[in-house]
């Protein structure tokens, strides 16, 4: 290829991008600002009102900023490209491209120095820190209100002292006019800053820091020291924070656009610059005229304010407003917020070759296809069509090709078909909550204007067809097309990255069709298994098909079939039964099985939504992706076809009301009467009554729901199932709660506050609601809608914070080589397993070797990726805990390693290097948040409380074992009453293996002694679900102590019942209401029982009681409805590491509790714990807190001592990092589990890891760290290694927990932090510290226009070069020549036109 410059290069349009790998930011000095400038702006005018040409020396001056028209000077003496680079001698304008008006800057020489508002107003004030002045004093000096002593000379005044006008005059009179120097305004501040000697200041501050012990002083000195070091290291001077020269940004970045009607639209910056220039010019004039000081001072202050408004309008004083009282947008506003430069233009750009349209369903499509309207495709694929038209010789120039396309000739349509074949397009649906919201498809051209979407991807997009719109994007380059095809094509995204479960699962109609085919009744199955000899026998599946076609048998008829799996090995099939020669099945199931690969075996069961997900997952594991995708398409066709044939529809007759409803409601009312009588007789309190009422109705509703469901399933004994039952049971549409409301009873409703109204709605929608019932319903319905609107925004914001904090976690290496990990176990809620061990260890790397105790074979070895089989085996042999590798313990300096991360859930393969696991984690956690917010909406606000049964029955036969720390006392009935919590009762078999275990609450009555035997379904324990009791450990005579009516206890008489009871109040005095038990004979004290505030006393003074009697009871917290409304804020609270409102106190040591009755310290109770070594450790507890431990209880490190939520910081402090990590992961997961959302632990672990990546320096040693610095753990380790290697003393630090917002702002990259929040503060800090951004994360690279450093842009792949295909050079050369010819042709035409005009 020749070396002559191409036409593009002559026009200054080079193709070579400028590459750089880091960006630094510092404070600019005046000379640098002048060096950027192409001339001084002295004139406030913009353009001439008559000629519309820029004014000379003004804000749009062509001499300074360059010509307004390409290759043409202002006066018109020089035109054309041949004069390029000449400066016109008449008008002084350089002949060049008009594009330079986007690059060339000007400047304004200020008459007096002016302070930069960011450096003194952004807290902490940088100028204030450098001069050790408060922001208020600084402000008074800068705005010409007070004087500051710059140089005290021989006077006793202090340097930097602030003097009012009066004090300054007095000092002048007293010490003489020239004896000291004081000034006001930015000028004086500049002199002060210029006088600072940075090395000396740094040394002084370092010494002060070493010698002070006060934490507050340390903090302040450390801040100053850090700033001084920043200036020193970045070779900048503090006086540059005061401006002598103001830069003027290029005019095309603050354009002035003519509108019709002779008006102009202008950028606000022009107004702000005009104010500055006007005031500056006026001040210059006044200074040359010997004007009085007062006027000049006022003018200087106005100049300062004008410059402030330009940089950050509204930061100081009232904002400068334009027409209609609208504040003008300053330079800071251009950067900040959603509409600012960072988020609007750098992180989110408009994309060329894209379109959007409404979506409709495309049932005829394959999974890898989408229907694209022809008229959209014509525009989207235009460049490819033009290229092909030229290639085939239909046209020779781009212009004529465009004309041909506009005419839509037949050959254009043919070429369009050819061009789109095999060229994937990307479809995106907003809101893009996770990566599956953008997938690639092969376009199928269709008539009409709507995009057609494959039904199986709707789940991933969360799309429905009620008017949703989607955007189409066309990948242009070959590399982009390859990535779209390899990584983004829909068949490659069958599984959810959040949980690894199939996400391309069928829903609604398809599920209904499959269920219709396979559905049978449980009763029939048993019946036919027993007497099946009368059933028709078929040799093969084809025979069954003939019989169906001939209408000899129907889908739901039972048949016998020769087993297609007979004789295979059990390992060869997943579902089939390999032992039977003949299986009993239905004709519908035979048809359902035709589409599945034979390797799965014969699926002989009811198939609903849940089973379908399982079958697809097994199918993928057995036969691989390609055949699974084909099967999915076959399933879609079968499902739609059979759903149509089933004729399934809902009529009002399908909503049958169960006959038991009436009797159940009557029973409930009878129960209510009993409760009311108990309340009237004073046996229970009002709170208990309310809770019992709520529980009675909850149970009644459940009983009616169960009866209704049974009735629907039975369907009056008809052969066909009820359509309503089919829809719900299959999971196609609706749920049991909705059916309950249709024809059961609506049940309890919630008030807007979340409390439950105790009168339920006994009617259902089939019967219709009364006016009152309808009115009560409106609460819930409205709350649902209001919640949805508010929470969607919250959830989106949380996702944004999560992405920001986790964005730089990328898989950087195969293995970091650590032996550390975390120990996981199954998670139980009460006695129900909510997360099995196998589900938690699947796809993770083991840290242990586990051997089968029977056969001796190694099931899992160290560093093995645990697959499903291994996970199940481990569970089978009774392994309860396993240590696995985790991102939390990964020791890689940057990102994490593949071994610590484990499996990539979306592919089921080991995670690849360069995978952006952090962003996947953030999306996996954020995406359901948005769905959960919608959850309240559908049930219409009926209250669902989690009601725990107060009776525990044994599930197995066995021996009952109490753990050693369980303390009980035998009561009068010979049963055992539990006295403490944090202990358990378990049932073991003869071999001593645990079968089940329960954690009893205080006051639980155990019916079987320790070591006793129990049979299955016998009652083991009962407890009071409404109260927390105080139990007497010893029998004797009751004596009240410190129980003074009106001070520590109140006598409450119930208005309705007249029964009175004593309730302990909260009080300020040093009194401790307690119940003392004395021996009946010797009168000696046997036990003290401190009674918490809010407790009702259940014994009388002087009464004789036996051991195990309840002395007092505190009502448990009243049940509110459980709903993600509590959930989303809870997740946010955990991730933001907020301190909970009334956090509990936790044990700082392990040992035995000693409750000292008299001990109080500053109005707080003292709980003492005696450690095994005999040391006593005091814990202070607020007076009104309910203590939940008792005398002689054994507590472990970190156990709760009082009621309330645990503060995460406290856990970190007391129990260390590992315990906190486990706590956070489990708490977050609990919220999602409650909503039935499955997220893999590893995603939460990544976020928790990011929250704990900083340490705070407690002892700097010989390192460069300062006391109280927060630094990355990796940086800390690196510097310590270097220091130790040089023989120095390493620094000491402790881990610190940051919330996700704080952690995002503390990131190493200032560009990433500035684009997140607090833009001005981040940039101010970065510039004064002279920070360098090494462009390692995502956002920095996107902002800089580079490829992201992950996936195919990862550094180890970016060195690969694409080898050009044969003949590529000729094509390039030819296209260059063609382009040159076209440009020349265009220029020639322009010249002719121009000459004609002349």
Curated annotation (Swiss-Prot):
Its EC number is 2.7.7.6. It comes from Akkermansia muciniphila (strain ATCC BAA-835 / DSM 22959 / JCM 33894 / BCRC 81048 / CCUG 64013 / CIP 107961 / Muc). Binds 1 Mg(2+) ion per subunit. Binds 2 Zn(2+) ions per subunit. Signal peptide: none annotated. InterPro entries: DNA-dir_RpoC_beta_prime, DNA-dir_RpoC_beta_prime_bact, RNA_pol_asu, RNA_pol_N, RNA_pol_Rpb1_1, RNA_pol_Rpb1_3, RNA_pol_Rpb1_3_sf, RNA_pol_Rpb1_4. This is DNA-directed RNA polymerase subunit beta'. The RNAP catalytic core consists of 2 alpha, 1 beta, 1 beta' and 1 omega subunit. When a sigma factor is associated with the core the holoenzyme is formed, which can initiate transcription. GO terms for cellular component: DNA-directed RNA polymerase complex. GO terms for biological process: DNA-templated transcription. Zn(2+) 2 binds at residues 816, 890, 897, 900. GO terms for molecular function: DNA binding; DNA-directed RNA polymerase activity; magnesium ion binding; zinc ion binding. The keyword Membrane does not apply. Pfam families: RNA_pol_Rpb1_1, RNA_pol_Rpb1_2, RNA_pol_Rpb1_3, RNA_pol_Rpb1_4, RNA_pol_Rpb1_5. It catalyses: RNA(n) + a ribonucleoside 5'-triphosphate = RNA(n+1) + diphosphate.
């Amino acid at each position: 290829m020749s070396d002559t410059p191409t036409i593009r290069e002559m026009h200054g349009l080079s193709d070579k991008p400028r590459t750089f790998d880091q960006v630094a930011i510092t404070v600019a000095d005046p000379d640098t600002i002048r060096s950027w400038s192409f001339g001084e702006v002295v004139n406030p005018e913009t353009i001439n009102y008559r000629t519309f040409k820029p004014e000379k020396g003004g804000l749009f001056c062509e001499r300074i900023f360059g010509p307004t028209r390409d290759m043409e000077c202002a006066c018109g003496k020089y035109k054309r490209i041949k004069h390029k680079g000449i400066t016109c001698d008449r008008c002084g304008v350089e002949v060049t491209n008009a594009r330079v008006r986007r690059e060339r800057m000007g400047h304004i020489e200020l008459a007096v120095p002016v302070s930069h508002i960011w450096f003194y107003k952004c807290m902490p004030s940088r100028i204030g820190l450098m001069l050790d002045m408060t922001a208020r004093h600084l402000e008074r000096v800068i705005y010409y209100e007070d004087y500051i002593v710059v140089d005290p000379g021989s006077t006793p005044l202090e340097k930097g002292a602030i003097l009012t006008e009066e004090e300054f005059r007095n000092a002048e009179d007293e010490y003489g006019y020239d004896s000291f120097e004081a000034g006001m305004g930015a000028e004086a501040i500049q002199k002060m800053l210029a006088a600072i000697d940075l090395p000396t200041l740094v040394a002084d501050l370092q010494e002060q820091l070493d010698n002070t012990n006060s934490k507050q002083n340390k903090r302040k000195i450390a801040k100053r020291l850090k700033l001084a070091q920043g200036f020193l290291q970045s070779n900048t001077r503090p006086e540059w924070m005061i401006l002598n020269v103001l830069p003027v940004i290029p005019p095309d970045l603050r354009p002035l656009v003519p509108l019709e009607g002779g008006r102009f639209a202008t950028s606000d910056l022009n107004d702000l610059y005009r104010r500055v220039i006007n005031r500056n010019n006026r001040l210059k004039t006044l200074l040359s005229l010997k004007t009085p000081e007062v006027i000049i001072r006022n003018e200087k202050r106005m100049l300062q304010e004008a410059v402030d408004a330009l940089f950050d309008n509204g930061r100081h004083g009232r904002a400068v407003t334009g027409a209609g009282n609208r504040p003008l947008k300053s330079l800071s506003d251009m950067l900040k917020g959603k509409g600012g430069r960072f988020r609007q233009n750098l992180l989110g750009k408009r994309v060329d070759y894209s379109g959007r349209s409404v979506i409709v369903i495309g049932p005829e499509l394959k999974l890898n296809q989408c229907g694209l309207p022809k008229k959209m495709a014509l525009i989207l694929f235009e460049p490819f069509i033009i290229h092909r038209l030229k290639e085939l010789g239909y046209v020779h120039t781009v212009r004529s090709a465009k004309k041909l396309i506009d005419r839509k000739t037949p050959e254009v349509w043919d070429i369009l078909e050819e061009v789109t074949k095999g060229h994937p397009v990307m479809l995106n649906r907003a809101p893009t909550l996770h990566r599956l919201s953008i997938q690639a498809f092969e376009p199928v051209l269709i008539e009409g204007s709507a995009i057609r979407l494959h039904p199986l991807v709707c789940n991933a997009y969360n799309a429905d067809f009620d008017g949703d719109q989607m955007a189409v994007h066309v990948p242009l380059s070959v590399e982009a097309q390859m990535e779209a095809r390899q990584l983004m094509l829909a068949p490659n995204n069958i599984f959810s990255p959040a949980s690894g479960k199939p996400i391309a699962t069928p829903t609604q109609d398809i599920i209904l069709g499959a269920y219709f085919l396979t559905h049978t009744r449980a009763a029939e199955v048993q019946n036919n298994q027993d007497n099946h000899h009368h059933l028709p026998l078929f040799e093969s599946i084809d025979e069954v098909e003939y019989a169906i076609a001939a209408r000899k048998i129907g889908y739901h008829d039972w048949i016998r079939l020769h087993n297609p799996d007979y004789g295979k090995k059990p390992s060869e099939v997943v579902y089939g039964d390999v032992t039977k020669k003949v299986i009993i099945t239905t004709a519908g199931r035979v048809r359902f099985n035709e589409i599945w690969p034979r390797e799965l075996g014969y699926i002989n069961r009811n198939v609903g939504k849940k089973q379908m997900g399982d079958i697809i997952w097994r199918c993928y594991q057995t036969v691989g992706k390609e055949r699974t995708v084909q099967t999915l398409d076959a399933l879609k066709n079968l499902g739609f076809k059979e759903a149509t044939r089933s004729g399934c529809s809902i009529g009002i007759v399908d909503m049958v009301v169960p006959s038991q409803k009436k009797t159940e409601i009557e029973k409930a009312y009878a129960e209510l009467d009993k409760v009311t009588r108990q309340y009237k007789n004073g046996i229970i309190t009002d709170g208990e009554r309310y809770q019992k009422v709520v529980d009675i109705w909850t149970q009644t509703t459940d009983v009616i729901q169960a009866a209704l469901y049974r009735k629907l399933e039975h369907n009056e004994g008809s052969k066909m199932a009820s359509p309503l039952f089919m829809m719900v049971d299959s999971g196609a549409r609706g749920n049991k709660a909705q059916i309950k409301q249709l024809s059961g009873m609506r049940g309890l409703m919630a008030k807007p506050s979340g409390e439950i109204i105790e009168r339920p709605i006994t009617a259902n929608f089939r019967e219709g609601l009364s006016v009152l019932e309808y009115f009560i319903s409106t609460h819930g319905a409205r709350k649902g809608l209001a919640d949805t609107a508010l929470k969607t925004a919250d959830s989106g914001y949380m996702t944004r914070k999560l992405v920001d904090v986790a964005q730089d976690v990328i898989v950087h290496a195969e293995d970091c080589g650590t032996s550390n990990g975390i120990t996981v176990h199954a998670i139980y809620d009460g006695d129900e397993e909510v997360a099995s061990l196998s589900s938690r260890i699947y796809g993770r790397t083991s840290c242990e070797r586990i051997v089968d105790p029977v056969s001796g074979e190694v099931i899992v070895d160290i560093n093995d990726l645990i697959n499903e089989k291994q996970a199940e085996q481990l569970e089978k042999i009774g392994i309860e805990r396993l240590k696995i590798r985790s991102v939390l313990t990964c020791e890689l300096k940057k990102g994490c390693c593949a071994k610590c991360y484990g499996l990539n859930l979306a592919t089921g393969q080991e995670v690849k290097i360069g995978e952006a696991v952090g962003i996947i984690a953030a999306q996996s956690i954020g995406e359901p948040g948005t769905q959960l917010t919608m959850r309240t909406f559908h049930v219409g606000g009926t209250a669902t409380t989690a009601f725990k049964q107060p009776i525990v029955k044994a599930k197995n036969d066995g021996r009952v074992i109490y753990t050693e720390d369980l303390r009980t006392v035998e009561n009068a009935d010979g049963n055992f009453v539990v006295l403490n919590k944090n202990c358990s009762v378990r049932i073991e078999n003869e071999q001593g293996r645990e079968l089940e275990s329960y954690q009893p609450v205080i006051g639980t009555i155990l019916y079987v002694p320790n070591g006793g035997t129990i049979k299955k379904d016998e009652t083991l324990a009962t407890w009071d679900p409404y109260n927390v009791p105080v139990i007497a450990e010893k029998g004797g005579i009751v004596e009240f102590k410190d129980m003074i009516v009106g001070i520590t206890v109140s006598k409450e008489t119930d208005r309705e019942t007249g029964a009175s009871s004593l309730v302990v109040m909260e009080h300020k005095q040093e009194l401790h209401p307690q119940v003392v038990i004395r021996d009946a004979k010797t009168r000696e004290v046997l036990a003290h029982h401190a009674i918490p505030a809010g407790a009702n006393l259940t014994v009388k003074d002087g009464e004789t009681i036996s051991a195990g009697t309840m002395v007092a009871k505190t009502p448990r917290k009243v049940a509110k409805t459980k709903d993600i409304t509590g959930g989303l804020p809870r997740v946010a609270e955990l991730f933001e590491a907020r301190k909970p409102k009334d956090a509990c106190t936790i044990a700082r040591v392990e040992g035995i509790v000693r409750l000292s009755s008299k001990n109080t310290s500053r109005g707080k109770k003292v709980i003492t714990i005696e450690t095994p070594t005999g040391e006593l450790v005091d814990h202070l507890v607020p007076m009104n807190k309910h203590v939940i431990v008792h005398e002689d209880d054994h507590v472990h490190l970190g156990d709760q001592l009082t009621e309330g939520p645990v503060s995460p910081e406290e856990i970190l402090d007391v129990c260390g990092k590992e315990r906190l990590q486990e706590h956070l992961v489990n708490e977050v997961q609990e919220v999602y589990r409650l909503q039935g959302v499955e997220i893999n632990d590893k995603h939460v672990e990544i976020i928790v890891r990011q929250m704990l990546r900083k340490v705070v320096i407690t002892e700097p040693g010989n390192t460069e760290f300062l006391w109280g610095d927060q630094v990355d753990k990796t940086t800390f380790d690196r510097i310590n290694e270097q220091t130790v290697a040089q023989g120095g003393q390493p620094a000491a630090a402790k881990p610190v927990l940051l919330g996700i917002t704080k952690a995002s702002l503390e990131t190493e990259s200032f560009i990433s932090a500035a684009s997140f929040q607090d833009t001005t503060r981040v940039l101010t800090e970065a510039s004064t510290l002279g920070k360098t951004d090494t462009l390692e994360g995502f956002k920095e690279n996107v902002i800089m226009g580079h490829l992201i450093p992950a996936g195919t842009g990862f550094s180890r792949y970016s060195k690969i070069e694409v080898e050009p295909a044969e003949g590529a050079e000729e094509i390039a050369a030819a296209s260059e020549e063609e382009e040159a010819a076209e440009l020349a042709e265009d220029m020639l035409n322009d010249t002719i036109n121009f000459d004609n005009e002349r």
